[in-house]
């Protein structure tokens, strides 16, 4: 791969990870401080027949995922650690979005409590695509550095 193309992918990975970090942290934080959004989230979880503990776990997962995406941007890390942190963030976001897709597909969840009132899981699937666009270059960076994952 050419140097210019590699730099372009690295730049896109950096911007997307920053965007995903800000989005996840913001929405997780809003679920904690905004009663309206928190109410919607409660309805989503309850109508999906997920356990009550999923409410707190979902909020924590969104905030922590956001922090993990932002962490490499807040401090300089070696390439080894930056790649590992981003892959953990991508894995966490993957799980959160799988739950979001599940919630969207539940017939008992009304569209009014979903983001933008959209019942099909368009938003979680789009976020999964963005997640893959960060994970693949992060994985390739680790592999090209010859750095073991374990």
Cite the ranges covered by each PLM segment.
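Membrane-interface extramembranous regions
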Residues: 2-150
């Amino acid at each position: 791969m050419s140097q210019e193309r590699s730099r372009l992918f690295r730049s896109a990975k950096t911007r997307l990870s920053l965007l995903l970090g800000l989005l996840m942290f913001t929405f997780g934080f809003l679920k904690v401080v905004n009663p309206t959004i928190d109410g919607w989230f409660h309805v989503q979880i309850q109508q999906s027949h997920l356990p009550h503990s999923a409410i707190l776990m979902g909020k924590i997962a969104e905030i922590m995922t956001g922090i993990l995406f932002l962490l490499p941007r807040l401090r300089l890390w070696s390439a080894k650690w930056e790649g590992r942190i981003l892959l953990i963030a991508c894995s966490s976001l993957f799980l959160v979005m799988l739950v979001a897709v599940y919630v969207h597909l539940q017939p008992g969840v009304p569209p009014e409590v979903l983001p933008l009132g959209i019942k099909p899981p368009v938003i979680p699937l789009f976020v999964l695509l963005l997640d893959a666009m960060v994970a693949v270059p992060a994985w390739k960076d680790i592999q090209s550095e010859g750095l073991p994952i374990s």
